[in-house]
Amino acid sequence: MKKPVVIGLAVVVLAAVVAGGYWWYQSRQDNGLTLYGNVDIRTVNLSFRVGGRVESLAVDEGDAIKAGQVLGELDHKPYEIALMQAKAGVSVAQAQYDLMLAGYRDEEIAQAAAAVKQAQAAYDYAQNFYNRQQGLWKSRTISANDLENARSSRDQAQATLKSAQDKLRQYRSGNREQDIAQAKASLEQAQAQLAQAELNLQDSTLIAPSDGTLLTRAVEPGTVLNEGGTVFTVSLTRPVWVRAYVDERNLDQAQPGRKVLLYTDGRPDKPYHGQIGFVSPTAEFTPKTVETPDLRTDLVYRLRIVVTDADDALRQGMPVTVQFGDEAGHE
């Protein structure tokens, strides 16, 4: 009976050793993953969208800036004048469009009707005169030239009458739809020009897009800039990202949302906390900046890690050690 008992105990011990070894191996696989990266360098060149003479600059190299802060201004005068012109253009176009919609006043219609009566009387007189001249020409009393003059006067009076009748007809029926549409299009064009003038005036003031530190100041007050010319280069300080690389064997551990610990040489015992925000969908050869020798010939995937408790001591370009593990994953 003792021999089976000993064998049973040996099997139990062996199973425990195997299970413990497997657990240790898995924990080492998970907890032991260490990556090396750098704090991402994020800079932006700031410029005016419009051109002009630099009136003032409010910051200098090394200054900390806040989102929404005024950094500089161009001479506003040209853009203020353009805005006034655009507003006047809208007023003129609006008045013309309103006239087209309203049609003609009763007084204008009455004047047009009176003009028709006057033109009708002139035509009747010219027609009668021409008829008389025709009879005289047949009796050889007047020359052919006199008859032609009478015909010309009659034709001119007829044209004047037709013009007056057309004008009265237009006044009574109102403006044509095509004319109204053209006036509306002119108004919309003037409104668009006004919006552009307002935007240009607004863009003659340079506003900080986000928090950061001013690295370089490329111009001074009095400089005449073309649109898009660089004025400042700014280092963006928030959010802080760490760029690291992981090989395919450990890719399953580097999933978006995974929490990690971030160590720097200046704080070896007080890590920062981060969370994986992005994993590149494509592999690439390891950049030269990666410090791990065994990764330099591998294809790796780029990670972006968002630092959740960053401070001013975490500077761009600084090397960082990224530690995976249960402690990081559950904090």
UniProtKB/Swiss-Prot annotation:
Protein's UniProt name: UPF0194 membrane protein YbhG
Gene Ontology cellular component terms for the protein in this record: periplasmic space
Main location (coarse class): periplasm
Gene from which this protein is expressed: ybhG
Coiled-coil annotated residue ranges, if any: 107-208
Protein's organism: Escherichia coli O9:H4 (strain HS)
Keywords: Coiled coil, Periplasm, Signal
Protein family: Belongs to the UPF0194 family.
Localization (cell): Periplasm
Domain of life: Bacteria
Alphabetical list of Gene3D superfamilies matching this protein: 2.40.30.170, 2.40.50.100, Helix hairpin bin
Range of residues in the leader sequence: 1-15
Listed SUPFAM superfamilies: HlyD-like secretion proteins
KW Signal (keyword) present: yes
Disulfide bridge positions per record: none
